[in-house]
Every structure is written in structure tokens, then in C-alpha cells.
Amino acid sequence: MKVVLQRVSEASVDVVNELGTLDPTFEPQQIGPGFMILVGVTDEDGDKQIAWLAHKILNLRVFEDAQGKMNRSIQDIGGEILSISQFTLFADVHKGNRPSFIKAGKPEHADLMWIKFNEALRSGGVPVKEGRFGAHMRVGLVNDGPVTIVIDTEHDMPDGTR
């Protein structure tokens, strides 16, 4: 799994239908201070990656304390998460000018892993709002910092836990 995490003061998502207008079947989602995360899944990802990544995000100390140091977690500040599934995080651009997405997980597997991942985040007591898997979305955010961190279970998980 790969996550691009951005610390935000606010973020929102809408779903756009095939006519290019807002999809009336999707209720727009908004959060206040917290994280907007883009989530990519491969076919090799499973429960171990979900548990490790959710724990890492819930405990990541990137919010400032009274002394202005990044020393507080999203749980500490009572923040929220906006989770957006994004297969394009696994784009391969080595050959030519058109990206290949062969490394991205198959939709059925990726959707299930994304749902389980969001539940793992919620189990840490943090409200999680979501986009719609596989949909064309408009995502808005106000970066705070900015603080942007890429976490990739393939490279960041300690050996022996993958």
C-alpha cells in the first residue's frame, strides 16, 4: 500500500458524474483539521499492511505542540481523515509518455482493502470520511504547513513484518 498524506486545515470531496456535473447520489464530504490521504493498493497488500499503515498514520506526530514542535498525533488533536482511493499512485512512467497502472491492485481487491483500511483508522477513534471508490472526484484541500508525507509499505515496513 502507498499513501500520500497531507496535513490539512480542511478538505472536501465531491463525485462528478459522466455529464461532468456533481453526482446527486453522493453526499459531499468535508473535514476540518487532520489528514487528507490518497490511498493506493496493490494485489499483494493484505491485513498486515493495513494494520501497520493504520497504526503508523494514527500515531504519526506531525501536529505542533505548545512549543511549535511536531509532537502531536491526529488522535492527540481530535482530528479527522478524508480518505481517497487512488490507483494512480502506482503509475509506472519508465517507458514512453503514457503511464502504466499494471502495479495497481485489481479493483475488487483494492476496494476491499481500502474499506478495511478505513475501518482500521476508525478503530483508532478518528472520524474518517471517504470519497467513492473508482469514481471521478473533485478533491479540495487547504494544506497546513505544508506537510506532505509519502508512506509505502513496500519500502517503509520493517523487514519481517511484510
Swiss-Prot record:
Q: Which reaction does it catalyse?
A: glycyl-tRNA(Ala) + H2O = tRNA(Ala) + glycine + H(+); a D-aminoacyl-tRNA + H2O = a tRNA + a D-alpha-amino acid + H(+)
Name of the protein in question: D-aminoacyl-tRNA deacylase
Kindly state which keywords UniProt assigns to this record, in alphabetical order: Cytoplasm, Hydrolase, RNA-binding, tRNA-binding
* Motif Gly-cisPro motif, important for rejection of L-amino acids per record, residues: 145-146
Q: What is its EC number?
A: 3.1.1.96
Q: Which PANTHER family match?
A: D-AMINOACYL-TRNA DEACYLASE 1 (PTHR10472:SF5), D-TYROSYL-TRNA TYR DEACYLASE (PTHR10472)
Q: Indicate yes or no for the key word Ion transport.
A: no
| Residues in the signal sequence | none
A biological process from GO? D-amino acid catabolic process
User: Which species?
Assistant: Bifidobacterium longum subsp. infantis (strain ATCC 15697 / DSM 20088 / JCM 1222 / NCTC 11817 / S12)
Write out the function statement from the record: An aminoacyl-tRNA editing enzyme that deacylates mischarged D-aminoacyl-tRNAs. Also deacylates mischarged glycyl-tRNA(Ala), protecting cells against glycine mischarging by AlaRS. Acts via tRNA-based rather than protein-based catalysis; rejects L-amino acids rather than detecting D-amino acids in the active site. By recycling D-aminoacyl-tRNA to D-amino acids and free tRNA molecules, this enzyme counteracts the toxicity associated with the formation of D-aminoacyl-tRNA entities in vivo and helps enforce protein L-homochirality.
Question: Which gene name does the record give?
Answer: dtd
